[in-house]
Amino acid sequence: MCGILGIVLANQTTPVAPELCDGCIFLQHRGQDAAGIATCGSRGRIYQCKGNGMARDVFTQQRVSGLAGSMGIAHLRYPTAGSSANSEAQPFYVNSPYGINLAHNGNLVNTASLKRYMDEDVHRHINTDSDSELLLNIFAAELEKHNKYRVNNEDVFHALEGVYRLCRGGYACVGLLAGFALFGFRDPNGIRPLLFGERENPDGTKDYMLASESVVFKAHNFTKYRDLKPGEAVIIPKNCSKGEPEFKQVVPINSYRPDLFEYVYFARPDSVLDGISVYHTRLAMGSKLAENILKQLKPEDIDVVIPVPDTARTCALECANVLGKPYREGFVKNRYVGRTFIMPNQRERVSSVRRKLNPMESEFKGKKVLIVDDSIVRGTTSKEIVNMAKESGATKVYFASAAPAIRYNHIYGIDLTDTKNLIAYNRTDEEVAEVIGCERVIYQSLEDLIDCCKTDKITKFEDGVFTGNYVTGVEDGYIQELEEKRESIANNSSDMKAEVDIGLYNCADY
């Protein structure tokens, strides 16, 4: 999972980089591994700053001040099917045709056939393991077919038709065409989120933004915004004071199935994605979870409800309300330690849990505790949390998950882990409870989770992590390839290579 952002300012003398940098802070939760900005200045020149680390560390004042231009895109990387090396930091760039930058959120699931096509038919070299570089080169190859001195909007839309025809997976992208326009597009199933917004200036002109979550628009006074529909694209001219954005439904909507995990864990609670309030879905999750808990436990089995901060707080609070039990903050979070779920390897996650969370013994001692978390993935965090609760004097610990049991790979851009490392894989609920050391594990049902998120317009979701049924289908051998890449990353062999990869405008700044 990644965060993407694009902004075009009407005033072409105003640098866009500071606002892109600030926007990245609001999307930092979507990726802490690397950050990057690319801007387009006068005469179509591209400027960039990118590297491993948090946005605040990569985007120093000195670096940002060198990013000229009123149009730009940004990316926050959470490593998925590539390495976590500098050479994989986005946005990616190709100089032919026309000079193109691209930032991508998601995963392609037919990468093997696409790489063969690029090599054997198009003769374009893909230099990294990132499917984002692959997607960029597919778009570039489709655009190059027009063989024109300058492109227009229709050429770009036509090239995107080729991208949609060739690429399978969940993806949302923002890109720059040097000196011409900013563009964005979303996969035909709407798996990955992308929103468009506008902000009116005092002189009547408008600035435009594309972003992964609505929270960025509100923070920057973009009061009018909407979701791009599945299969829809938009082109925003560089000189947007003289030209309007153009939208096109490039391909028909295949289905409208946002990823359930956005609402369970990934998105900020103050965001609204596809017209669905993340906060209100999590409240509903807490209510439904409480109903399920009461089917399995007696009221006297629970003395207190304690959340795993931060994501589970909303769910846990509503769960406690429905149960009629006190809600307490039993864990103090060290905000200077990253989200353990997004950390690139297991060793970091294990050591991070106790650095990240410290129990308050008074909330556990002598009590029967219900701990609520958003999900149980590898079980790393859950096991350590149960241990801390018991070390702090809890007489019994029950563990409730706002999400159903996760037994399958996530293939659209969230690196849950290999299937065999999922704690619920080939285990019953009782066996999961035994592994993490608690008295009982209680999961949300998939039916209840969907009920918490659905609206009149959206009634189905991408739920492959819970069912094993993926909306796009999967190319033969893809999951094995995905797991081999993850293993390579875990062993650092991929990163050792990638740190010295050459990158024409793709290398990081440090």
Curated annotation (Swiss-Prot):
GO biological process: 'de novo' IMP biosynthetic process; purine nucleobase biosynthetic process; purine nucleotide biosynthetic process
Bound cofactor: record note: Binds 1 Mg(2+) ion per subunit.
Enzyme's top EC category: transferase
Catalytic-site annotation from UniProt: 2
Pathway per the UniProt entry: Purine metabolism; IMP biosynthesis via de novo pathway; N(1)-(5-phospho-D-ribosyl)glycinamide from 5-phospho-alpha-D-ribose 1-diphosphate: step 1/2
Cofactor(s) required for function per UniProt: Mg(2+)
Glutamine amidotransferase type-2 domain residues: 2-239
Pfam annotation, one family: Pribosyltran
Classification lineage: Eukaryota, Fungi, Dikarya, Ascomycota, Saccharomycotina
EC number per UniProt: 2.4.2.14
Species this chain originates from: Saccharomyces cerevisiae (strain ATCC 204508 / S288c)
Binding of Mg(2+), residues: 373-374
Name this protein carries in UniProt: Amidophosphoribosyltransferase
Family: In the C-terminal section; belongs to the purine/pyrimidine phosphoribosyltransferase family.
